[in-house]
Amino acid sequence: MKKGMDSDPKIKIQYASKYASTSNYWKYFIGQSKGLKRMKVYNKKVKLENLFRTWMDSTENRKSKYGNVLENIKNAYVENSKISANRLFLNEAIFSGAEILYFSYKIHRSISQLPDKKDLEKRSVAIKKIKLEAEKFYKNYNSIIDEELLSAMLEMYYYNVPSNQHAPIFKNIENQLLGFKKLDFDYYAENVFKNSIFSSQEKFMFFLKNPSVTTIESDPAYKTIMSIYNKYVLDISVKRKNIRQTLQKENRLFIAGIQEMLPKEKFYPNANSTMRVTYGNVGGYQPGNAVHYDYYTT
């Protein structure tokens, strides 16, 4: 993305917001990692768990009530570690990577909801809305950059997600080896863009003259994203749901135990889905040694 932006002022404008969004996300996690280390969060949690174990083991009643809670939480996280990369790379490399994939996913939904051909007026209005959405999409779209992104993101997914969780689409890529030791993701991406109706505004607008779900479902971009997504839904999402339910149940019990152990301690609630009030002074801040950020950007 950066290489393309540096090569052409037009591309720089097209991708400025996308690049900034990706950069902010990357910096956000760098900041989080630094904060966790600086605040010694892990050490504090270990200390709290050890304190809880000592308190719990002091009576049979507590052991009966809370005896398995920490082990159950640990086991749930161990199981989650086996599938967490799948969801992470599904979101970041597939749904938020090459734009052609998610665009095909959205358009499939829009086309499948089109009014019947018998109702020409309503159908025409719906198609016009899709055209407007497409014009907005292609205004800031460069197929050369997106093709490179598709290749890079598929390769990243392939080598970071366990092979037993790979979607059937990766078997197609493996079958392209032709004697080479390294998989050719560039070749696969090139063929997707060569044959997809979503790789250019001209091809997509031609498709809208006679849109059909069947055409989309045979499109290589749509087949790529759905192969990976369906594999996740069938094999991973159910496991993840069970793990989350276990963690929710065990964490609730653990917090109840902590509150019982420290009755005078004040505990703050989970802020998600709550109303919040922000107050204070507008100003810059110092996130690290000799680093100062103003409250505005230029």
Locate predicted features.
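Terminal presequence/propeptide segments associated with secretion/organelle targeting
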Residues: 1-298
